[in-house]
């Protein structure tokens, strides 16, 4: 079992992408910005909040936003 989530995505351009994780109540618990290159990209979320605390079991939402398009995916954490 891993405490990490590998997030893989494709980009058409060199662009800045904002990643956010929200809890079921819509509160942002973690966020970062990443520079993306054309093609496949990936990064690892360590399963922690912005304060470095491990998040508890539950439903979360990952949002990727490049300024033109926003994608949201549901994440279920089971500890």
Where are the regions that the model predicts?
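Surface-exposed loop/turn motifs at beta-strand-loop junctions within extracellular Ig-like
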Residues: 23, 49, 66-68
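Short, glycine-anchored, charge-dense loop/turn motifs used at functional sites
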Residues: 21-29, 60
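Glycine-centered coil/turn sites that cap beta-strands in beta-rich domains
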Residues: 1-23, 41-46
């Amino acid at each position: 079992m891993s405490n990490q989530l590998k997030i893989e995505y494709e980009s058409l351009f060199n662009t800045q992408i904002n990643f956010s994780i929200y809890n079921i109540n819509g509160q942002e618990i973690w966020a970062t910005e990443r520079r993306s290159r054309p093609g496949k990209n990936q990064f690892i979320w360590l399963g922690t909040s912005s304060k470095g605390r491990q998040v508890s079991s539950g439903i979360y939402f990952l949002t990727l936003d490049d300024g033109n398009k926003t994608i949201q995916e549901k994440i279920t954490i089971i500890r």
